[in-house]
């Protein structure tokens, strides 16, 4: 998949799994419609809503040279009721 980098598993994203919301880091240049198309095509689900925000890159220093890592986008995707993405479902222990 060109637009989606990987799924995110933070405290918030794990909590959102109970609300049928999944969190992904995506390419910065990808549009919402592209990501929606990729998720529906690849996982075989129907997307109800999408929220996105851009996270800033971190500063990096190598000696006197100051640089930074690339910024990236994070999408929170809400699926319609009755759909889920099985490999990303949180296991109950």
From Swiss-Prot:
Single GO MF annotation: structural constituent of ribosome
Domain of life, per the record?
Eukaryota
Location in or out of the cell: Plastid, Chloroplast
Q: Name one GO biological process term.
A: translation
* Family the UniProt entry places it in: Belongs to the universal ribosomal protein uL23 family.
- Asked if Plastid is a keyword of the record, the answer is yes
Subunit architecture: Part of the 50S ribosomal subunit.
Concerning InterPro entries, the annotation shows: Nucleotide-bd_a/b_plait_sf, Ribosomal_uL23-like, Ribosomal_uL23/eL15/eS24_sf, Ribosomal_uL23_CS
Cleaved signal peptide residues: none
Query: What HAMAP family does the entry give?
Result: Ribosomal_uL23_B
- PANTHER family with a match to the protein in the record: 60S RIBOSOMAL PROTEIN L23A (PTHR11620)
List the PROSITE patterns.
RIBOSOMAL_L23 (PS00050)
Q: Which UniProt keywords apply?
A: Chloroplast, Plastid, Ribonucleoprotein, Ribosomal protein, RNA-binding, rRNA-binding
Q: Which GO terms describe its cellular component?
A: chloroplast; ribonucleoprotein complex; ribosome
Q: Which residues form a coiled coil?
A: none
RNA-binding as UniProt keyword: yes
- Recorded protein name is Large ribosomal subunit protein uL23cz/uL23cy
Q: What does this protein do?
A: Binds to 23S rRNA.
Q: What is its main location?
A: plastid
């Amino acid at each position: 998949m060109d637009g989606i980098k990987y799924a995110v598993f933070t405290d918030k994203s794990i909590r959102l799994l109970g609300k049928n919301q999944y969190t992904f880091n995506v390419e910065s240049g990808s549009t919402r419609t592209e990501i929606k198309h990729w998720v529906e095509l690849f996982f075989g689900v129907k997307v109800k809503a999408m929220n996105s925000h851009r996270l800033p890159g971190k500063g990096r220093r190598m000696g006197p040279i100051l640089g930074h890592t690339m910024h990236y986008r994070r999408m929170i995707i809400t699926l319609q009721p009755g759909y889920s993405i099985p490999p990303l479902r949180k296991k109950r222990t």
